[in-house]
């Protein structure tokens, strides 16, 4: 491909045994995890996605990995939308505390993107409506809404009926009303 694009390689859900008529079965699956930008060069993902800086350096974080509606196939991504990990600033993966996150520094600031605002105190409302944005099963960006908090009695996490899969690990989950 051209010098300003990377070729996307990966199979499809159909290649993994999903029926060919299933929704998204023909779309390219490449991502292993999801993440979200919290500062120009800082990304949050799941702690089990990044085991350390040497492991993290093997990952690429891609923005605009999505289909435009006219095709199910993503053959290339712009080089400018592909970032590398240079530092794992903080990581936690603990069954005791139920924490599973990593804060990583990217190789350069992400341009043309506004980092998300993260709730830093309190907890989500017991009846909050939720939205998740990520890469379920390695698919291009998907947005799933229509979900809500089901159980909210733990300090570290809540239970929801969000439609998420492997690959959504590290996805941003938003309160549909406040955006936080």
Spans of model-derived segments:
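RNase H-like polynucleotidyl transferase catalytic core
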Residues: 159-162
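Catalytic nucleophile loop of clan PA
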Residues: 36-37, 164-180
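Serine endopeptidase catalytic core focused on the charge-relay Asp
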Residues: 1-30, 37-40, 44-157, 175
């Amino acid at each position: 491909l051209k010098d300003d694009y990377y070729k996307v390689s990966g199979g499809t859900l159909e290649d993994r045994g999903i029926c060919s008529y299933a929704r998204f079965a023909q779309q390219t699956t490449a991502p292993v995890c999801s993440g979200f930008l919290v500062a120009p060069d800082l990304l949050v993902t799941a702690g089990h996605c990044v085991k350390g800086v040497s492991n993290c350096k093997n990952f690429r974080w891609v923005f605009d990995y999505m289909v435009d509606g006219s095709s199910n196939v993503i053959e290339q991504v712009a080089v400018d939308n592909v970032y590398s990990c240079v530092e794992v600033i903080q990581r936690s993966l603990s069954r005791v505390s139920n924490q599973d996150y990593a804060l990583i520094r990217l190789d350069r600031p992400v341009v043309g993107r506004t980092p998300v605002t993260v709730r830093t105190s309190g907890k989500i409302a017991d009846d909050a409506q939720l939205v998740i944005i990520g890469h379920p099963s390695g698919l291009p960006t998907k947005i799933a809404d229509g979900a809500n908090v089901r159980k909210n009695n733990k300090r570290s996490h809540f239970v929801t009926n969000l439609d998420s899969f492997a690959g959504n690990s590290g996805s941003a989950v938003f309160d549909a009303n406040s955006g936080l």
